[in-house]
């Protein structure tokens, strides 16, 4: 199976469809799999109903329905997520269950931007989806060229309003349904053989060109959340955890950040499954031996990080999804002054919620932004995910949108 190994050399990019209900996200997702499969038989073709009955998965204690599809373009390998319901999108984007390197915003040309179009763009901005490509769907239902131009202008303005480069990003006009039907009639429809299928290729070209290949986790600065600490007699203190990003090796200086004053130390050993390693890298579960650090100097909930790369903070703004009662969340609203636990990486820290002006209370099932002040500092940066818990049970999920102090 030489082919399988060859595919793996392509850069991997995570994308997803976003946009208003019934604007054609799932139909487009199906059309993309059929288009890619016409060129590459290893791609699994998925019909609308196979994608629509998305399996449930759990992320940070929250149940989300998400469909995952995969496909190749000549340049890349893509993982693509599509969610059946609006609430699933909100939960998905806030928990980071499906991290997106870029999103395909689907807008019906017949309707133009709708409330969820705006909401998904805002969410993409808040949770840090860096790039958006637009697919104006259902152009076969619009006879008036001027109307199409008007919708395109509206979409570009809306994106600019939320600080995406609305004037410059790609907008592809097509019909996912027409493309899908053409491919269902002739699954081998190649590029250049059908104008609707060509529009899907145009979209794939646009995501290839416009969404940059993400920096690999191993190329980023080192960070490891501490899960456990123990002492090896005669050797010193070991912190264990899964390396979140970057690489660590013997001799590297690191800082221990969060919960107390930042402390600098040097790595004197890295091991995995009781074997010594040259280096630990993103994704590895490792034990890191730290020079001159007492057993009580480091604890679960702190992080080991490259010096100067991350700082401890107590106050931040967040975008939050509050679980509904049916999802096992609270049964009643909460108000300003609410004091739950905020679970960051490996530990809970109590914090106080301050609601924005004009917001009296927050109901279960709401998506809301507010400010939090923690009683202890946590190593924090924008884009960091957390869960909100009461007595160990998850009642919400959030993402840090702005670090305040």
From Swiss-Prot:
- Tell me the leader sequence span: none
Sites binding GTP sit at 19-26, 82-86, 137-140
* Residues reported to bind Mg(2+): 26
- Which enzyme class, named as a word? hydrolase
Grouped into one coarse class, the protein's main location is: cytoplasm
SUPFAM superfamilies under this entry? EF-Tu/eEF-1alpha/eIF2-gamma C-terminal domain, P-loop containing nucleoside triphosphate hydrolases, Translation proteins
Q: Is Chloroplast given among the entry's keywords?
A: no
- What segment(s) does the record annotate as region G2? 61-65
List the residue ranges of the region (G3).
82-85
Give the start-end ranges of region G4: 137-140
**What domain of life does the UniProt record list for this protein's source?**
Bacteria
A Pfam family this protein belongs to?
A: GTP_EFTU
Subcellular locations according to the entry: Cytoplasm
The Swiss-Prot or TrEMBL record describes its family as follows: Belongs to the TRAFAC class translation factor GTPase superfamily. Classic translation factor GTPase family. EF-Tu/EF-1A subfamily.
How the protein assembles, per its UniProt entry?
Monomer.
Enumerate the HAMAP family for this protein: EF_Tu_B (MF_00118_B)
Please describe what this protein does.
Answer: GTP hydrolase that promotes the GTP-dependent binding of aminoacyl-tRNA to the A-site of ribosomes during protein biosynthesis.
UniProt cross-references to NCBIfam families, sorted A to Z: EF-Tu, PRK00049.1, PRK12735.1, PRK12736.1, small_GTP
Full protein name: Elongation factor Tu
Please report the organism this UniProt entry assigns to the protein.
Deinococcus geothermalis (strain DSM 11300 / CIP 105573 / AG-3a)
Gene that encodes it: tuf1
């Amino acid at each position: 199976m030489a082919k399988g190994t060859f595919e793996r050399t392509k850069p991997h990019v995570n994308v997803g469809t976003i946009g208003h209900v019934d604007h054609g996200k799932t139909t487009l997702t199906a059309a993309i799999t059929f288009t890619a499969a016409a060129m590459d038989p290893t791609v699994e073709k998925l019909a609308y109903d196979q994608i629509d009955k998305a399996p449930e998965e759990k992320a940070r204690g929250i149940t989300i329905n998400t469909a995952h599809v995969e496909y190749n373009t000549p340049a890349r390998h893509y993982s693509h997520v599509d969610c059946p319901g609006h609430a699933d999108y909100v939960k998905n984007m806030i928990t980071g269950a499906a991290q997106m390197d870029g999103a395909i915003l689907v807008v019906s040309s017949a309707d133009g931007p709708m409330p969820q179009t705006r909401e998904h763009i805002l969410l993409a901005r808040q949770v840090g989806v860096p790039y958006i490509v637009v697919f104006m769907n259902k152009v076969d239902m619009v006879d008036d060229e001027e109307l199409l131009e008007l919708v395109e202008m509206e979409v570009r303005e809306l994106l600019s309003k939320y600080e995406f480069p609305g004037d410059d990003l790609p907008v592809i006009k097509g019909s996912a349904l027409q493309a899908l039907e053409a491919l269902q009639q002739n699954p081998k429809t190649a590029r250049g053989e059908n104008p609707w299928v060509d529009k899907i290729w145009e979209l794939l070209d646009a995501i290839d060109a416009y969404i940059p290949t993400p920096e690999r986790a191993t190329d980023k600065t080192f960070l490891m959340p501490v899960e456990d600490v123990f002492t090896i007699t005669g050797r010193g203190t070991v912190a264990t955890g899964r390396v979140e990003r970057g690489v660590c090796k013997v001799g590297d200086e690191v800082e221990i950040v969060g919960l107390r004053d930042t402390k600098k130390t040097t790595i004197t050993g890295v091991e995995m499954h009781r074997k010594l390693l040259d280096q630990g890298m993103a994704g590895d579960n490792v034990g890191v031996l730290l020079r001159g650090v007492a057993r009580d100097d480091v604890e679960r909930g702190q992080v080991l990080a490259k010096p100067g790369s991350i700082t401890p903070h107590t106050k931040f703004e967040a975008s939050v999804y509050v679980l509904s009662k049916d999802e096992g969340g609270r049964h009643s609203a909460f108000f300003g002054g609410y004091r739950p636990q905020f679970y960051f990486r490996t530990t809970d820290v109590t914090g106080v919620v301050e609601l924005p002006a004009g917001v009296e209370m927050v109901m279960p099932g709401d998506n809301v932004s507010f400010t939090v002040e923690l009683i202890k500092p946590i190593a924090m940066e924008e884009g960091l995910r957390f869960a909100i818990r009461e007595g160990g049970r998850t009642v919400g999920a959030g993402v840090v949108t702005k670090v305040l102090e």
